[in-house]
């Protein structure tokens, strides 16, 4: 009995080393291919959901915010848009959905949507005079005004074009050319007036039948006025139609007309090309700076995805329709609960055989807990932890870099004749967004599964590293722990952790202790067998006496 008791006490006080992993108070949850809402020690949100609700400078360059003016009102020079007569370089253009100051004289702007698309590749215009207003000596250049375009309570007209009227009851045929001697392309605008009736035609232009011819090396245009009775818009029954072209360097534009001509006075020299956009937004300027702008506000984020608005300008995350994208960077967070029986202390283990993580180990993801006569403590395995951190960091950065390539996310505009094309374009863009969203969500699910498996594998590798060193000098307890068959002081424990454990040095002591424990087990088994036989014989004898007594009594 004394030998058995000593053996049990010896077992309780045996030195131990355990392999485990970090745990903390995190409540972060991620989804994987196999599971939802897995709690992890560390996670990284890769979906930006916030913006500042302002229009900002883009990389230090201010946007051109047209306020109540449209692009057409700005380019033609609506009198109510005088603040935009000369504008500095812009990063992007902001136009309201329904600006009040558009074409003050009712009409149409030909290929307007195409012009807006052109502006999405331009960052700066320089306005230059190409045909001075004072050069029209045979025509009335100052009488072409309208109450539809008021300025300071008086009739006015677009600032950048001239509405030519007959002079002294005559409208001589115009033949005027302009040669682009600049090194830059020129944006030139002109127009035609469509009167309400024949009386207005002769009143303004004298000639009942008129035309306008415009030609460049790439353009051959002939226009005739469309005289028709129309309902009034802005008090006008007439209409104006405006046109534009890009005149290349060393090319010339030629105008010929005998009436109804709205001549260019100013043109726009395209002095800087680059990525720009025309963004529809009602926001105000916020005196801020950003790398990514949306119609809802600026995004300042290094995340690879956002769900704020599909239209963006700048270095932006990719838009997806998801509400949540979280990457696991740490381990499954399963803190081990303290047990009632504390003979072994807090020991944990990995998926499959380790019961929980250690909150006491704070300086690494994987590591050890040891206990011996000198005490106990946690120690992180710095090498495996650092390799894991590098691997996860590289993976996250790789995902961000891979997903940073974005298709053009600036909306296109279509005229009324192109609605079917617009609908098709929207369906295609919606399809792209659906694909990107699916890819992003699938990528996150797969990477989270791989990350958690990666951590499990690292802990298992650390366990195997210890197991292969100790061999039969220690016993595997099945919960991530090893119980030594020999005394293992702190120096011995450190050698196990750093991989320099000397198996032969401790093998003899371990063998003797192992044999002693085996002997105690055998002796205990023999004692229990004797007691069992004795108990059986005694019980049988008592039963026989009782049966005999009963027989005599019955006789």
UniProtKB/Swiss-Prot annotation:
The keyword Disulfide bond applies. It is found in: Virion membrane; Host apical cell membrane. Residues 551-555 are cytoplasmic. Disulfide bonds join 18-481, 56-288, 69-81, 104-149, 292-316, 488-492. The record marks 344-345 as: Cleavage. Residues 15-529 are extracellular. Binds to sialic acid-containing receptors on the cell surface, bringing about the attachment of the virus particle to the cell. This attachment induces virion internalization either through clathrin-dependent endocytosis or through clathrin- and caveolin-independent pathway. Plays a major role in the determination of host range restriction and virulence. Class I viral fusion protein. Responsible for penetration of the virus into the cell cytoplasm by mediating the fusion of the membrane of the endocytosed virus particle with the endosomal membrane. Major glycoprotein, comprises over 80% of the envelope proteins present in virus particle. Homotrimer of disulfide-linked HA1-HA2. This is Hemagglutinin. It comes from Influenza A virus (strain A/Guinea fowl/Hong Kong/38/2002 H5N1 genotype X0). The lineage of its organism: Viruses, Riboviria, Orthornavirae, Negarnaviricota, Polyploviricotina.
């Amino acid at each position: 009995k004394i030998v058995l008791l000593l053996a049990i006490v010896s077992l309780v006080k045996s030195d131990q080393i355990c392999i485990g992993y970090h745990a903390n108070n995190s409540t972060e949850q991620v989804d994987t291919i196999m599971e939802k809402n897995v709690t992890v020690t560390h996670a990284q949100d890769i979906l930006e959901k916030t913006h500042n609700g302002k229009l900002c400078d883009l990389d230090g360059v201010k946007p051109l915010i047209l306020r109540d003016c449209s692009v057409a009102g700005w380019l033609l020079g609506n009198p109510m848009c005088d603040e935009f007569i000369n504008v500095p370089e812009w990063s992007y253009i902001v136009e309201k959905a329904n600006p009040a100051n558009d074409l003050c004289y009712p009409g149409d702007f030909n290929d307007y949507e195409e012009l807006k698309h052109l502006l999405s590749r331009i960052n700066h215009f320089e306005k230059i005079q190409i045909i001075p207003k004072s050069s029209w000596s045979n025509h009335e250049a100052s009488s072409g005004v309208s109450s539809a375009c008021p300025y300071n309570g008086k009739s006015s007209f677009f600032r950048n074009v001239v509405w030519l009227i007959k002079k002294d009851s005559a409208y001589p045929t115009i033949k005027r050319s302009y040669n682009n001697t600049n090194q830059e392309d020129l944006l030139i605008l002109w127009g035609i007036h469509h009167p309400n009736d024949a009386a207005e035609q002769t009143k303004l232009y004298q000639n009942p039948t008129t035309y306008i011819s415009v030609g460049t090396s790439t353009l051959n245009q002939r226009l005739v006025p469309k005289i028709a009775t129309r309902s009034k818009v802005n008090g006008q029954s007439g209409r104006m139609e405006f046109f534009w072209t890009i005149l290349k360097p060393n090319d010339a534009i030629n105008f010929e007309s005998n009436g109804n001509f709205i001549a260019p006075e100013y043109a726009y020299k395209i002095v800087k090309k680059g990525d720009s956009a025309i963004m529809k937004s009602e926001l105000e300027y916020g005196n801020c700076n950003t790398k990514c702008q949306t119609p809802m506000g600026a995004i300042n984020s290094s995340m690879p995805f956002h769900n704020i608005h599909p239209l963006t300008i700048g270095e932006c995350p990719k838009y997806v329709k998801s509400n949540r994208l979280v990457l696991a960077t740490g381990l499954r967070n399963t803190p081990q609960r303290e047990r009632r029986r504390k003979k072994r202390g807090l020991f944990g283990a990995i998926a499959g055989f380790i019961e929980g993580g250690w909150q006491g180990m704070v300086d690494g993801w994987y590591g050890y807990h040891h206990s011996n006569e000198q005490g106990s403590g946690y120690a992180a395995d710095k090498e495996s932890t650092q390799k894991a951190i590098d691997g996860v960091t590289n993976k996250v950065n790789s995902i961000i870099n891979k997903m940073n390539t974005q298709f053009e996310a600036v909306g296109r505009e279509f005229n009324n004749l192109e609605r079917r094309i617009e609908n098709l374009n929207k369906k295609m863009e919606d399809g792209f967004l659906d694909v990107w969203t699916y890819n992003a969500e699938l990528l996150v699910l797969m990477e989270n599964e791989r990350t958690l498996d990666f951590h499990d594998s690292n802990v298992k590798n650390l366990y195997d590293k210890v197991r292969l060193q100790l061999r039969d000098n220690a016993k595997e307890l099945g919960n991530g722990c090893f119980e030594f068959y020999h005394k293992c002081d702190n120096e011995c424990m450190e050698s196990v952790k750093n991989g320099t454990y000397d198996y032969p040095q401790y093998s003899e002591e371990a063998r003797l202790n192992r044999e002693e424990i085996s002997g105690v087990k055998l002796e205990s088994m023999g004692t229990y067998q004797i007691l069992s036989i004795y108990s059986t014989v005694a019980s049988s004898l008592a039963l026989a006496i009782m049966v005999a007594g009963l027989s005599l009594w019955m006789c």
